[in-house]
């Protein structure tokens, strides 16, 4: 799934230590979380691997999770820690977020597919963040790549556009009342519908403020 998503985005992937070197950490309290090979238990090792890659790449900017890991998943939080430990203090770092206002507004423009529901305020507030510093509007081509990358993660994401996969063989269709503003919808395995927005949102985590991701670099 990851390889297919990277291909859809035109991104070259680097697997730190090789595929399977770091194990999924699961949620706190689970056996996976206690596994000595889990990413959450190997932050320093992962940071060493990443530091070597960053030294070779010398990036102008880094996109990663914020301190909350997006919605609190331990592996996402671990990735944040690894990046902050490995990155040079001078490199600009952006946290990718689900913008709270944009997602609340987006949900108002759609109806959930049959059998799905809209998320509660508690869920939304945990899933989203307030105050994006930079909003990147997506071109039609970029939005199409985003859809294909999301569809590639069939065990994680279900697009509510009528498409099917081997993982999700039954189609689901959300009613989109303002498709120019919200051109799609998706859900996780919990079948809570979320708007698929034609933009990406970022908060500045490190470096000089800018009006766009590479501004002034």
Named regions from a protein language model:
Residues 1-89, 214-215:
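Active-site beta-strand->loop->alpha-helix modules in alpha/beta enzyme cores, enriched
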Residues 11, 27, 52, 57, ...:
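C-terminal accessory domains and tails appended to enzymatic cores
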